[in-house]
Amino acid sequence: MNILPKSIPIRIQSLRRYQGSLKTSLRALSTRPIFEKRLLAETPFSIRPSNASVLIAKRSPKFGWKQVRFYAANPNGGNFRMDLGGGRKQGAALEEYGTDLTALAKQGKLDPVIGREEEIQRTIQILSRRTKNNPALVGPAGVGKTAIMEGLASRIIRGEVPESMKDKRVIVLDLGALISGAKFRGDFEERLKSVLSDLEGAEGKVILFVDEMHLLLGFGKAEGSIDASNLLKPALARGKLHCCGATTLEEYRKYIEKDAALARRFQAVMVNEPSVADTISILRGLKERYEVHHGVRITDDALVTAATYSARYITDRFLPDKAIDLVDEACSSLRLQQESKPDELRRLDRQIMTIQIELESLRKETDTTSVERREKLESKLTDLKEEQDKLSAAWEEERKLLDSIKKAKTELEQARIELERTQREGNYARASELQYAIIPELERSVPKEEKTLEEKKPSMVHDSVTSDDIAVVVSRATGIPTTNLMRGERDKLLNMEQTIGKKIIGQDEALKAIADAVRLSRAGLQNTNRPLASFLFLGPTGVGKTALTKALAEFLFDTDKAMIRFDMSEFQEKHTIARLIGSPPGYIGYEESGELTEAVRRKPYAVLLFDELEKAHHDITNLLLQVLDEGFLTDSQGRKVDFRSTLIVMTSNLGSDILVADPSTTVTPKSRDAVMDVVQKYYPPEFLNRIDDQIVFNKLSEKNLEDIVNVRLDEVQQRLNDRRIILTVTEAARKWLAEKGYSPAYGARPLNRLIQKRILNTMAMKIIQGEIKSDENVVIDVLDGELEFKANKLEPQSTSHED
């Protein structure tokens, strides 16, 4: 029964309210029984209830149970630092932050290491020292520094090491795991300290390998506390820690040599790039692993091509890594082709689907035409399905053979790994069975199935990686044509002079020199240590020096925009050289790459044009000396840029006054000698001596100009095609243009201006006024010494023909 008046609850709600929490001491008392029970249950040593009260008072209210540190009485005396939930056992840090290479070697998961005998032996010698037994593998990225430690782990497993190195473990430190989650100051140092403690506790039985060691040594500096290098120094000096690091020469100089105390604790082992021959041996050793992984065959020609092409065309990386990447990518490309439907089957599927859709639309039609059409489609559909079934069966059969070969190779590899393991474990009964029964049977079955596949001559599936596949990968990555010449390309190269000669009139000598250089390159006979070719084009203005270079780029790449052009009038000052290779350190723009070096790095197969070279500063020629002779140029960042796949053209107007004064339209020996005298006085001999050919262009004759008129009018017609306007120029008008546009001193440029002024400007006005419309034929003739324009409506067949 409610005895309170109804007004009291309303009154209470109107009063001021206070909210808050219990005091810390009260909250501690309320949680005390729970905490005492948990603490006594999880502490790995005996603790008195009286101490539990002290522990509760010492805990920080800011953190949860896992982050709170407690101090309890150690039964042996003194204080013992502990984490709630139990202490860390010996070696736990190495398990958490490391990967055991020797365990992976036992399982056969490491690739075989070919060569590197000297580097591995040197590493073992340093590890066997009493103090400062810490090798540092120093070398460029991709030369195989990590592989040396994998080779050491494999040798330890096989027992191919000195007695003092047997039964040791090689553990790779995982820097990502070591850093991740270290949110609070001191967390990283504590983790590293636990790793070092585990290593010292292993008593020399563990070799710690730190890949990218310069990253580890720099950690901790940002927090202002003791960094990793200072934690490592005492252990490294005492010899209690077997640590092997790997880094590049640049990072070694930047992070380790700068600290003399740290540098003297490591012994550098230089790991140089292997030769092409050594790389081929490495690829042959890895061949079986990649065949098993991808399920394809790799020919020996493909391995040789991968090593030679990677050394020749991929210059910004190092062997053997870049060669292995070529083989791996070629294998993956072939594997995708095998797992996808062949093009013939996909084409049949599309045809069948199209017919089925059409049949569905004709299903309810009853007229005679529709019925006949339906019968024809049904007959065609039956034939296509029969062909589809036949091809599908052949494809499935070929795929089954390939899968069978892949399965046999996988079983053979697993059997060999098991044989090594059983021999180590002393299980000689199983080892005997593997060595004399299982492995020989598998070794016989693999060639047998491969022979069966070859006899069937598979047409649907390509089963082998060849040198052509490697060449395709190189071409795709660099843009450099390395594939074998196809029939159409052969004909194109053989007729190169005639093709370019349709646009460049009257310069047969220059065309021949350019065509010979390109053919030499595509045949693979050019000097591999120089650019494809280098030319100096000399002659008066307007004779086609720049136009020939544009036509060459269009011939090679189907667009004249593939040419990299530098107008040398922009480089008249000495400081503008920095624009080509990048600014030196300390100057504005140092981080930006040079215009020349960056363009060639991005497009190594290109036509380089240095237009009007004589207008540039003389130091530009000194810069080009190395490019013309060695095919390399070093930019401001220290990167070597490869120019060996470029074709370099330099144009100049030096001596043009001599050629203009000569009445002959072709270059006479006397004129040539006079021009070359001027050139030799202007450029140093070491520059001219490095150029492959110096070509003097002919003056344009009146007959040449008539041919150029036809070329220019064809270009005008290309612009009018979009408007469906046909341009018809009479023979009289063509001769009028050639006469009015001829100038021995200025070449073809006056003709271009004449066509612009007398034809294009007039037609533009008439189009805007509506006098010339689409689908009309514009006839240009000469009347009273001037050009006359007449527009006639096109016949329908003419319009369709032009379209």
Curated annotation (Swiss-Prot):
Instruction: Give GO terms: molecular function aspect only.
Output: ATP binding; ATP hydrolysis activity; unfolded protein binding
Disulfide pairs here are none
The UniProt entry's GO biological process terms, in alphabetical order, are: cellular response to heat; protein refolding; protein unfolding
Which residue spans adopt a coiled-coil conformation according to this UniProt entry?
343-431
Which segments carry the region annotation NBD2?
465-656
InterPro entries in the cross-refs: AAA+_ATPase, ATPase_AAA_core, Clp_ATPase_C, ClpA/B, ClpA/B_CS1, ClpA/B_CS2, ClpA/ClpB_AAA_lid, ClpA_ClpB
Its subcellular locations are: Mitochondrion matrix
Locate the region NBD1. Answer: 94-342
Q: Respond yes or no to whether keyword Iron is given for this record.
A: no
**UniProt cross-references to Pfam families, sorted A to Z:** AAA, AAA_2, AAA_lid_9, ClpB_D2-small
Instruction: Supply the alphabetized keyword list.
Output: ATP-binding, Chaperone, Coiled coil, Mitochondrion, Nucleotide-binding, Repeat, Stress response, Transit peptide
Could you tell me which residues form the transit peptide?
1-36
Question: What PROSITE patterns does this protein's entry cite?
Answer: CLPAB_1 (PS00870), CLPAB_2 (PS00871)
One Gene Ontology cellular component term attached to this UniProt record is: mitochondrial matrix
Keyword match Glycoprotein: no
* Residues that, per the record, bind ATP: 139-146, 539-546
Question: What's the entry's take on its domains?
Answer: Has 2 AAA ATPase type nucleotide-binding domains (NBDs) per monomer. NBD1 is primarily responsible for ATP hydrolysis. NBD2 is crucial for oligomerization.
Q: Which family does it belong to?
A: Belongs to the ClpA/ClpB family.
Q: How does it assemble?
A: Homohexamer, forming a ring with a central pore.
Functional note: Required, in concert with mitochondrial Hsp70, for the dissociation, resolubilization and refolding of aggregates of damaged proteins in the mitochondrial matrix after heat stress. May extract proteins from aggregates by unfolding and threading them in an ATP-dependent process through the axial channel of the protein hexamer, after which they can be refolded by the Hsp70 chaperone system. Required for resumption of mitochondrial respiratory function, DNA synthesis and morphology after heat stress.
What name does the UniProt record give this protein?
Answer: Heat shock protein 78, mitochondrial
Q: Which gene encodes it?
A: hsp78
